[in-house]
């Protein structure tokens, strides 16, 4: 996993230096996955950290779906979502992994690869490096429930939601209280959320990975 905090945070700025995102609804805020004319995800900004993973929007039994595949690459997609996480604290999503990076283990820098990662990003200005990221991951090796600080920067914290191949090939519905998780991980009140990210990487292990993500939304 390759995450460069300053580069990520700077990329979140609009041309006028302001944060932008969808209007929050009273009880629910969807993070739309819409197929663009070229097959990519409309409104999602790609960032290729190492090589170029394949990503596209397809229709599955879970609805409009992000399909990601990696062969020794590392790629993230970002979607603006500016809101107070305390108002809509619950992140909901569906995901499916069909191939995990061989030997991936978030606890070690040399094997820090996952088939699928879902992040909520909290910008902190004026110093971009201060931005906080809460990541929910499907790891190959680390046990479910593991809380891990990134081996590259302390401002990125992970919670292992799924691990190993037991549920490979199955759609799984997830739900996390991001507000509570942020407070637990960083021991502080969260600032305004800025973006959501979906990522796949298998560059450190030089292996392959494949995953699917659908129906992302925040709720009370």
Where are these regions (language model features)?
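Extracellular/lumenal carbohydrate-interaction signature centered on repeated Trp-anchored short motifs
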Residues: 80-91, 165-168
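Extracellular beta-strand elements of beta-rich domains used
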Residues: 36, 196, 214-218
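Solvent-exposed strand-to-loop "edge" motifs in beta-rich extracellular domains
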Residues: 94-100, 123-125, 179
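Extracellular/luminal beta-rich ligand-recognition
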Residues: 111-156
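Extracellular beta-strand ligand-recognition surfaces/modules
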Residues: 113-118, 154-164, 168-207
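Extracellular carbohydrate-recognition regions
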Residues: 19-49
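Bacterial N-terminal signal peptides
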Residues: 3-15
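Short carbohydrate-recognition loop motifs
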Residues: 56-76
């Amino acid at each position: 996993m390759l995450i460069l905090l300053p580069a990520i945070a700077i990329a979140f700025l609009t041309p006028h230096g302001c944060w932008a995102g969808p209007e929050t609804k009273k009880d629910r805020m969807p993070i739309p996955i819409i197929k663009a004319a070229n097959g990519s995800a409309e409104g999602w900004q790609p960032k290729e950290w190492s090589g170029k993973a394949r990503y596209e929007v397809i229709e599955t039994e879970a609805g409009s779906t992000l399909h990601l595949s990696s062969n020794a690459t590392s790629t993230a997609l970002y979607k603006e979502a500016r809101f107070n996480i305390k108002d809509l604290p619950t992140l909901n999503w569906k995901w499916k992994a069909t191939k995990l990076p061989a030997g991936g283990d978030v606890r070690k820098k040399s094997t820090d690869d996952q088939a699928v990662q879902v992040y909520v990003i909290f910008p902190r200005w004026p110093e971009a490096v201060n931005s906080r990221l809460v990541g929910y991951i499907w790891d190959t090796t680390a046990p479910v429930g593991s809380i891990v600080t990134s081996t590259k920067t302390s401002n990125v914290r992970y919670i292992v939601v799924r691990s190993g191949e037991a549920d490979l090939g199955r759609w799984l519905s997830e739900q996390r209280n991001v507000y509570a998780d942020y407070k637990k991980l960083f021991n502080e009140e969260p600032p305004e959320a800025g973006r959501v990210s979906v990522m796949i990487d298998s560059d450190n292990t030089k292996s392959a990975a494949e995953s699917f993500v659908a129906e992302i939304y925040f709720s009370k």
